[in-house]
Amino acid sequence: INAVVEVHTPSITNLDDHNEQEPREECGVYGVWAPGEEVSKLTYFGLFALQHRGQEAAGIAVGDDDRIVVFKDMGLVANIFDESTLSALQGNVAVGHTRYSTAGGKEWSNVQPMFSTSSTGVDIALGHNGNLVNYLELREEAVQRGLIKPHEESVSDSMCLSMLLADGVDEDTSVFDSARD
């Protein structure tokens, strides 16, 4: 499986000068790699614990050697996932995400994890916390590669990154090499 998770945790230097002692809300990201375990349930409980970081939406991507399955929706973690849904999310690796919008609208298309497939069939699930400071440059690169239309406004920074990573993967280039490029 080729899954990439980028995690950013804000530090005190990222806080507004006026509120240095107060935490800022940002998303929560939780990852699990545990062969032989029910990673969807472990991820669910991790997201439940992180839910204070984002109560707008949540999602879990679970994978094995053959595929990645993503389930995500708007709402609280406990309202999105039930026993039936978690049982259907089978695999040995997972990434979960709770959303608090800082960029992009409060709409389903911005709920993470993001999912993209490379031209060679490699699936990528990405959970991202924070804002990409070079989003406009990445977006322009995605437009130049034909991944998004020039005037398409609904592409979040995380979806843009996911599409660029997938686009860079081929027989000779791994997801990790694509991220370095």
Locate the predicted segments by residue.
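Conserved short alpha-helical segments that host acidic/polar catalytic motifs at enzyme active sites
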Residues: 2-181
